[in-house]
Amino acid sequence: MMKKIDVKILDPRVGQQFPLPTYATSGSAGLDLRACLDDAVELAPGATTLLPTGLAIHIADPSLAAVILPRSGLGHKHGVVLGNLVGLIDSDYQGQLMVSVWNRGQQSFIIEPGERIAQMVFVPVVQAEFNLVEEFDATDRGEGGFGHSGRK
């Protein structure tokens, strides 16, 4: 079942010059977000910048959130990833979707107007309430943390 999410177009080029986010295939999890820029932006090695998408969403359902994730090709081929690694969009947020990009590569990268820069995935949310305890029931793992199970 397709969930309906309210979206506002903040830049008139979205839906005209720049396509609205859509799923590329019936099995796609993410919707591509585009850089809603007037001019190309040069992202120097090590630099970060905040890019507008021209869209605002209001999820409204507290059992849902959206995450903004990098596009694998930009990171692998060009070293361009999200500046905050993952963006979290809460259900009650109503502002413009902005994407923080970071060039961790060795070469400058040019971001063109309308270029696909990130992807957005809707995820279920469970809000939890903490139950204060003095001790936990014992488990096989216990406090075993990073690397406790080995590499093979």
Swiss-Prot record:
Substrate binds at residues 71-73, 84, 88-90, 98. InterPro entries: dUTPase, dUTPase-like, dUTPase-like_sf, dUTPase_trimeric. It catalyses: dUTP + H2O = dUMP + diphosphate + H(+). It comes from the Bacteria. Keywords: Hydrolase, Magnesium, Metal-binding, Nucleotide metabolism. CDD domains: trimeric_dUTPase. GO terms for biological process: dUMP biosynthetic process; dUTP catabolic process. Its cofactor is Mg(2+). Belongs to the dUTPase family. This is Deoxyuridine 5'-triphosphate nucleotidohydrolase. It comes from Klebsiella pneumoniae (strain 342). The lineage of its organism: Bacteria, Pseudomonadati, Pseudomonadota, Gammaproteobacteria, Enterobacterales. The gene is dut.
